[in-house]
C-alpha cells in the first residue's frame, strides 16, 4: 500500500474552478491561490444566505488512542460516498496546525484514499490563515506592551495581563518567558508565555464569527488584562479591534479544496478540541449547508469534547443543528478501553471488545440526550477479525444503534457506501429535535456540573481555590451567562488520561477559569492540560524532506 503522500501525489487534481461548479459556485466567486485552492468571496456567501439549509452530518468519535481513530479520514470518505450515491455533498473540515504536523501527527488531511488535496499545501502554509491569526494575536500583545511603555493610561496591572503570545509550533520552552528585559527603552519587564496558535481566542473568534462586522465586535470584546482595581480591560479600551480585523479580513473567508474523489471541501479554521472548542468555522459550515443537500463536518477528539462543544457552543451560531451524528469507533481503541496493552492491540480479544464497548455506549447515550439520531461507523483495520466485528455489531444492536463497517482508507468512496446509506436512512427515519444540555441563564457551576455528570458520567465538579474566586468574580462581570468550554484530556471521560473505558465515581476538578468573552465562552482548565504542546522524542519532522524539484516527502 502506498503512503498517504504517495497516494495524494498520484491523484491528478482538477482546477478548483471546475470542482466547485458542482455546488453552484462560479469562477468569479473565487479568490484563487493557484489552480487548486481558493477562498470564497463575501459576495457569494451573502448571496446564498437565503437558501434553505440542507442536511448536516456531524462526525465524532469515541475517546481515542494516541494514534487517533480516523475521524477526518471517515468524514472525507463519508462525504465522497454520499457524492457517489448521488447526493449533492460538501465537506467542512478544520485546517491542520503546523505544530502537531511537525510533532506527532505528520499531517492532518485524512488518509489513504480519503484525503483532501493538495495535502502538502493544506498541511503546511495553505492560504496563510494560521499566519494571519498568529499575527493578529501577537499584534495585540505588542500593543498591550506598548500601552504599558507609553504611560499605561488604562491602569493595567502588568501582573494581571492574561493575553499570552502565540506560535503555530509545539515549543514547550516558550510556555513561560520574561519580556521587557534590558534597558527601560525595551519595555516594562513582566512574566509572559506562549500558547499554540490553535488555542488562541483569535482562532476561536474567527471560527465563530458570521461576518466582518461580527468579527470586529467579538475582537473588541476580548478581555486582555485586569486593572489594579481588578476590573477587566477589553480590546475596545485599547481601540485596536479595527486593526486586528484588518489583519484578518482575508483569513475569515472560507478556503475551498477538493477530495480525492472530487467532492468540494471547505477547510477553514482549526481550534483544538481539548483546549478550545474544536470545530471548523461557522462561515464554512453555514455556507456549505446553503450550497449542498448534505454537509459533512467533524468535531475534534472524542464526543465528550468536540461533539459536546459543537452542540453547546457552535450549533447556536448555525442555521440548524445536526440531522445525524456519526460516532467513529475502532476495534483497537475499544480493546484499549477494555484493558488491553498497546502492544497487544493487534491480537484478537472479543472479551476486551465487550468490556471496552462501555466507552462507545456512553458516547451514544450522550448524543441521544441532544435528541439527534446516531450511527456508529467502524473504521476497519487489517488486524480486525470477523469475530471482533460480529461482537461489536451485536452490542450495537442491543442498544438499537445502526452500525456499519467502513473501509474508506483503503477503498475511498466505495468503502463508505454502506455507511452513507445508513446515515441517509437514519436522517429519513428519525427527525432530530435538538436541545442543548444547559441554558444560558444557568450559572457557570450548573453548566459545568451538567457536563461532568451528564456527559462524562462523573459524580460532580470540584473547584480549586483560584477557580472558586473566579466563579464569584465572573458572575459580577456577567460572564456566567456564557457557555463553558472544558480543557480536558482527550483520552478519558475523566481528567485522568489513564482512566479508560467508561469510568464513574470520579470528580472533575477545575483549577482555573479563563474568560474568552470575545469568542463567547469560558474555558475551564482541568488536570495538567497544556495550551502549548511539546514535541515527542522523535518528532515527525525528522522524517520530512523536500526533493530538488520541490516535492514534499514524509508528510502522512
Curated annotation (Swiss-Prot):
PROSITE patterns attached to this UniProt entry: FTHFS_1, FTHFS_2
EC number per UniProt: 6.3.4.3
MF term (GO), any: formate-tetrahydrofolate ligase activity
Binding-site residues for ATP, renumbered to this chain: 65-72
Pathway noted in the entry: One-carbon metabolism; tetrahydrofolate interconversion
GO biological process: tetrahydrofolate interconversion
Highest taxon listed in the record's lineage: Bacteria
Enzyme class label: ligase
Keywords: ATP-binding, Ligase, Nucleotide-binding, One-carbon metabolism
InterPro entries registered for this protein in UniProt: Formate_THF_ligase, Formate_THF_ligase_CS, P-loop_NTPase
Family of the protein in this entry: Belongs to the formate--tetrahydrofolate ligase family.
Listed name of the protein: Formate--tetrahydrofolate ligase
Amino acid at each position: 500500500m502506498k503512503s498517504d503522500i504517495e497516494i495524494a501525489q498520484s491523484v491528478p487534481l482538477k482546477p478548483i474552478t471546475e470542482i466547485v461548479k458542482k455546488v453552484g459556485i462560479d469562477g468569479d466567486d473565487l479568490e484563487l491561490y493557484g489552480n487548486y485552492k481558493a477562498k470564497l468571496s463575501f459576495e457569494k456567501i451573502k448571496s446564498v444566505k437565503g437558501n434553505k439549509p440542507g442536511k448536516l452530518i456531524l462526525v465524532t468519535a469515541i475517546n481515542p488512542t494516541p494514534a487517533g481513530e480516523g475521524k477526518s479520514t471517515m468524514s472525507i470518505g463519508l462525504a465522497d460516498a454520499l457524492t457517489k450515491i448521488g447526493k449533492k455533498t460538501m465537506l467542512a473540515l478544520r485546517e491542520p496546525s503546523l505544530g502537531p504536523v511537525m510533532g506527532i501527527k505528520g499531517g492532518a488531511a485524512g488518509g489513504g484514499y480519503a484525503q483532501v488535496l493538495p495535502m502538502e499545501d493544506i498541511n503546511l502554509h495553505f492560504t496563510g490563515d494560521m499566519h494571519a491569526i498568529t499575527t493578529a494575536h501577537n499584534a495585540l500583545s505588542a500593543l498591550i506592551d506598548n500601552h504599558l511603555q507609553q504611560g499605561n493610561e488604562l491602569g493595567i496591572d502588568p501582573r494581571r495581563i492574561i493575553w499570552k503570545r502565540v506560535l503555530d509550533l509545539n515549543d514547550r520552552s516558550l510556555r513561560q518567558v520574561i519580556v521587557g528585559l534590558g534597558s527601560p527603552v525595551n519595555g516594562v519587564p513582566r512574566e509572559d508565555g506562549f500558547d499554540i496558535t490553535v488555542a488562541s481566542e483569535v482562532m476561536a473568534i474567527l471560527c465563530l464569527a458570521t461576518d466582518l462586522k461580527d468579527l470586529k465586535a467579538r475582537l473588541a470584546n476580548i478581555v486582555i488584562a485586569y486593572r489594579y482595581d481588578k476590573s477587566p480591560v477589553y480590546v475596545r479600551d485599547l481601540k485596536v479591534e479595527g486593526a486586528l480585523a484588518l489583519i484578518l479580513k482575508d483569513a475569515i473567508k472560507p478556503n475551498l479544496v477538493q477530495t480525492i474523489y472530487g467532492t468540494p471541501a471547505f477547510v477553514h479554521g482549526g481550534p483544538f478540541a481539548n483546549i478550545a472548542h474544536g470545530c471548523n468555522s461557522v462561515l464554512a459550515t453555514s455556507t456549505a449547508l446553503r450550497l449542498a443537500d448534505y454537509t459533512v463536518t467533524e468535531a475534534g477528539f472524542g464526543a465528550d469534547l468536540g461533539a459536546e462543544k459543537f452542540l453547546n457552543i457552535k450549533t447556536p451560531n448555525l442555521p440548524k443543528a445536526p440531522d445525524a451524528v456519526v460516532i467513529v469507533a475502532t476495534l483497537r481503541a475499544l480493546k484499549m478501553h477494555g484493558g488491553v496493552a498497546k502492544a497487544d492491540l493487534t491480537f484478537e480479544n472479543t472479551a476486551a471488545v465487550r468490556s471496552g464497548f462501555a466507552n462507545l455506549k456512553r458516547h451514544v447515550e450522550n448524543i441521544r440526550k441532544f435528541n439527534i439520531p446516531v450511527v456508529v461507523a467502524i473504521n476497519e483495520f487489517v488486524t480486525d477479525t470477523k469475530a471482533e466485528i460480529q461482537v461489536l455489531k451485536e452490542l450495537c444492536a442491543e442498544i438499537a444503534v445502526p452500525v456499519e463497517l467502513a473501509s474508506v482508507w483503503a477503498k475511498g468512496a466505495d468503502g463508505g457506501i454502506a455507511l452513507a446509506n445508513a446515515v441517509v436512512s437514519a436522517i429519513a427515519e428519525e427527525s432530530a429535535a435538538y436541545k442543548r444540555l444547559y441554558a444560558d441563564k444557568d450559572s457557570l457551576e450548573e453548566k459545568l456540573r451538567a457536563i461532568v455528570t451528564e456527559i462524562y458520567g462523573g459524580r460532580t465538579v470540584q473547584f480549586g481555590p483560584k477557580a472558586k474566586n473566579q466563579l464569584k468574580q465572573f458572575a459580577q462581570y456577567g460572564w456566567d451567562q456564557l457557555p463553558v468550554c472544558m480543557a480536558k484530556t482527550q483520552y478519558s471521560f475523566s481528567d485522568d488520561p489513564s482512566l479508560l473505558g467508561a469510568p464513574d465515581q470520579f470528580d472533575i476538578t477545575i483549577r482555573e477559569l479563563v474568560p474568552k468573552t470575545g469568542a463567547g465562552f469560558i474555558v475551564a482548565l482541568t488536570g495538567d492540560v497544556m495550551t502549548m504542546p511539546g514535541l515527542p522524542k522523535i518528532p515527525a519532522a525528522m522524517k520530512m524532506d523536500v526533493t530538488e524539484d520541490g516535492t514534499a516527502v514524509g508528510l502522512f
